[in-house]
Amino acid sequence: MKLILKENVDNLGHIGDIVKVAPGYARNFLLPKGFAIEATEKNAKALEHAKRHLEYKKNKVLEAAKQLAAKIEGLSLSIAHQAGADDRLFGAVTNMELAEQLKANGIEVDRKRIVLAEPIKQLGDFTATVKIHPEVSATLKVAVTKA
């Protein structure tokens, strides 16, 4: 019996695969649990349509992420912080402060997506990585000045 898998099934296949299984395995396990549907022409067309739609949405999200990355790359943040005599900051510049600065510039990014290689505890120029999408990240320039 030919089936189209709706879920990943161990030792059988992945989502969207057309597999041939014993009729009893299909009737008693795969179909009742919703792991598969019969491989009719109608179901195959519906599956292809769903795959195309998913691919389109994925590409649209990726394009938006690339545009946001380009915006962030062209931006340089300037943060004024209190510092001591040897240019060491009282405290540190955190990813939360960077997220607030980005928000003030019209770019909304979750603070957890901003990655600092090490805490910023001195005056000077630094970079931070913003992970916008699993495939797209941007480098943010940060200048820390004395308040």
From Swiss-Prot:
Keyword set includes Iron: no
Its cellular-component GO annotations read: ribonucleoprotein complex; ribosome
For this protein, the record's InterPro entries field holds: Ribosomal_bL9, Ribosomal_bL9/RNase_H1_N, Ribosomal_bL9_bac/chp, Ribosomal_bL9_C, Ribosomal_bL9_C_sf, Ribosomal_bL9_N, Ribosomal_bL9_N_sf
| Signal peptide per UniProt | none
Top-level division of the source organism's lineage: Bacteria
* Gene Ontology terms describing biological process: translation
Classification via Pfam families: Ribosomal_L9_C, Ribosomal_L9_N
Record keywords: Oxidoreductase included? no
Q: Which UniProt keywords apply?
A: Ribonucleoprotein, Ribosomal protein, RNA-binding, rRNA-binding
Q: Name the PROSITE patterns on file.
A: RIBOSOMAL_L9
MF terms (GO), sorted A to Z: rRNA binding; structural constituent of ribosome
Q: Which family does it belong to?
A: Belongs to the bacterial ribosomal protein bL9 family.
State the protein's purpose: Binds to the 23S rRNA.
Mind telling me what this protein is named? Large ribosomal subunit protein bL9
Quick one: which gene encodes this?
Answer: rplI
